[in-house]
Amino acid sequence: MKAAGYSDTYMSVVIKAFTTEDKISRFDGWDSINKAGVKTATTLGTTFETLSKNWFPNSDLTLIEAPARGDQEVLAGRSDVFITSNVEGSTLLSKYPNIREIPAAPRNPTPLAMLMPQADQVWINFVDHWVKIKKARGFFDELAKKHGL
C-alpha cells in the first residue's frame, strides 16, 4: 500500500471567532468568549466541536446537526459566537454584512499543501520549486490579501 505524497506548504488555514455587529462590543479576544452566559454554536461532529469544547468550557455550547451550521445560529440570534477557518470566515464576512470577526490572534494554524503521487519525485520536485518561486514573488500573500485571508 502506497501513501500519498505532499508538496511543500504554501499557506496556512487558521481558526478565528465571529459574532454579529450588535454583539461585537462584548468580545475582545478568546478569553471573553470563554465565559458563562456566552452562547457558542458549532456543528456536531466537526473539528470545530472539539476545539469549542476545549477552548470554551465555561460558555454555553450549542451543537448543531448538519446541514445546519453555527454561523446560522449566530445570524438567527440564538447564539453569540461561532468559530471557523479564515477561509470560510472570509466568505461569510463578504456574504453577510452583519458578521464581525472577533479581534483575537488566530489559532491552530494548519499548513496547506498539494496532494501528490508519492512515487513521482520528479513531479514533487517540480511543484515544490514552483511553490518556492511563487512564495518568493509574493503570489500567495497577494492571494491571501485578495480573498481576505
Predicted features by range, described:
Residues 20, 45-46, 66-67, 83-90:
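Beta->alpha turn/N-cap motifs
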Residues 33, 73-75, 114, 127:
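Hydrophobic residues within well-ordered alpha-helices
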Residues 30-46:
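Short loop->beta-strand "edge-of-pocket" segments that line small-molecule binding or catalytic clefts
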Residues 37, 46-62, 101-102, 131-149:
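Ligand-binding clefts/hinges and TM-proximal coupling segments of bilobed small-molecule sensing domains
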Residues 16-25, 110-130:
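A bilobed periplasmic-binding-protein/Venus flytrap-type ligand-binding module shared by bacterial periplasmic
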Residues 1-3, 51-54, 75-108:
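A ligand-binding cleft/hinge motif common to bilobed small-molecule-binding domains
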Residues 25-28, 62-76, 108-110:
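Short helix-initiation/N-cap motifs at beta->coil->alpha
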Residues 1-32, 98-107:
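Acidic, polar ligand-binding/catalytic clefts
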